[in-house]
């Protein structure tokens, strides 16, 4: 199979990919509810032939293409779920499901992987090893559907896993990549400060949970600035502080939530210990009590490093020839194949969709790409 023949197959599938993307965009489904989406993907894959299909979970799909010769096992993954956003567009393939929209490009990811599966199914005689096409459900919810799929065995025996995400800030025709650490582990924390409520005019009869919570928030910031080497990437953000229902009443409790982003596994396991030590010390000093919970999300995305002598195969060299641009390392804006890649090498790319303008994130509501 020559490059010209492959290009011909790519050109031939282009119309299908656009049609699939528009169908998916018009019929978005939320995380763990992707039943019609999964059925559409399954039936579309079934029409290609040569693929062994399965449903690892209720709303996910896996297709296996077994080559004619032995070789490595490569997995390619796309996400399928939409977001709880009301679409404001008026074009014919705008969302038909009120309050649900493909606002993050998962319709495009799914359509592209369908197109990839169709092309490879026509190249079966030239394939060595196995290709697994993984259509993941529930990427948007914490900790996501990847864990269920891994537990179902979709990654058993996989050597390399590949994924991509549409990224509007990129120039058209460019592929963005970071070798080594690319996206951080997105963990979250929950803190409840339990004091003693009372009238706002008699604070001496209370244990002021708001004042205690404010001290906790302030002191948590010292973890990044004073506990960790300045060259070590770490983000700790308090994103919610909930307390009280009346202007003249001091509440008995405060709830604090937020996120922690890390690349280093040792630091990742140490940060919650530091956090709880701070919370414990402050609450005990003021006669309050606390609850602390730290939920671990996906592992960090660490692309197989280009400096590794085992890396830099034909696929990566082809990407470079086509035109790739560096991306800044990110603290986990996207939750990708961290669980999928736990036991396999990974390569995660970004590419721009065919949108009319380059946008900085967060992306605007219009989904102007195909």
UniProtKB/Swiss-Prot annotation:
A Pfam family of this chain: Peptidase_M20
Cofactor: Co(2+)
Stored InterPro entries: Amidohydrolase, Bact_exopeptidase_dim_dom, Peptidase_M20, Peptidase_M20_dimer
Key words, A-Z: Cobalt, Hydrolase
GO MF annotation: an example: aminoacylase activity
Reactions accelerated catalytically: an N-acyl-L-amino acid + H2O = an L-alpha-amino acid + a carboxylate; an N-acetyl-L-cysteine-S-conjugate + H2O = an S-substituted L-cysteine + acetate
Origin: domain of life: Bacteria
Keyword check for Hydrolase: yes
Known EC number: 3.5.1.14
Subunit structure: Homotetramer.
Homology family: Belongs to the peptidase M20 family.
NCBIfam families membership: amidohydrolases (TIGR01891)
Protein purpose: Hydrolyzes most efficiently N-acetyl derivatives of aromatic amino acids but is also active on other amino acids. L-stereospecific.
Protein name: N-acyl-L-amino acid amidohydrolase
Organism: Geobacillus stearothermophilus (Bacillus stearothermophilus)
């Amino acid at each position: 199979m020559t490059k010209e023949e492959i290009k011909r197959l790519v050109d031939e599938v282009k119309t299908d990919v656009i049609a699939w993307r528009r169908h998916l965009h018009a019929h978005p489904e939320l995380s763990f509810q992707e039943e019609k989406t999964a059925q559409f993907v399954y039936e579309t894959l079934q029409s290609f032939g040569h693929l062994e299909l399965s449903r690892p979970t209720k709303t996910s799909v896996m297709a296996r293409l077994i080559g004619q010769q032995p070789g490595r096992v490569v997995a390619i993954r796309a996400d399928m779920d939409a977001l709880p956003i009301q679409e404001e567009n008026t074009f014919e393939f705008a969302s038909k499901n009120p309050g649900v929209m493909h606002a993050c490009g998962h319709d495009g990811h799914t359509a592209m992987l369908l197109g990839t599966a169709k092309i490879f199914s026509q190249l079966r005689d030239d394939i060595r090893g196995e290709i697994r096409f993984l259509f993941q459900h529930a990427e948007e919810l914490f900790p996501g559907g990847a864990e269920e799929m891994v537990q179902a065995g979709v990654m058993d025996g996989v050597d390399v896993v590949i994924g991509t995400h549409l990224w509007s800030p990129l120039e058209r025709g460019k592929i963005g990549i970071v070798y080594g650490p690319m996206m951080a582990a997105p963990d979250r924390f929950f803190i409840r400060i339990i004091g003693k409520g009372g009238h706002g005019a008699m604070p001496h009869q209370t244990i002021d949970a708001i004042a205690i919570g404010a001290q906790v928030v302030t002191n948590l910031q010292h973890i990044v600035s004073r506990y960790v080497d300045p060259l070590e990437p770490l983000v700790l953000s308090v994103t919610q502080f909930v307390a009280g229902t009346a202007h003249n009443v001091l509440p008995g409790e405060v709830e604090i939530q937020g996120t922690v982003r890390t690349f280093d596994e040792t630091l990742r396991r140490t940060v919650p210990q530091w956090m709880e030590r701070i919370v414990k010390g402050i609450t005990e000093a003021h006669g309050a009590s606390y609850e602390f919970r730290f939920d671990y999300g996906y592992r960090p995305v660490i692309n197989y490093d280009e400096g590794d002598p085992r890396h830099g195969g034909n696929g990566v060299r082809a990407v470079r020839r086509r035109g790739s641009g560096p991306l800044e390392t990110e603290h986990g804006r996207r939750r990708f194949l961290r669980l999928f890649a736990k036991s396999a090498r990974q390569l995660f790319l970004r590419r721009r969709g065919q949108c009319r303008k380059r946008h900085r994130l967060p992306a605007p509501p219009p989904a102007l790409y195909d």
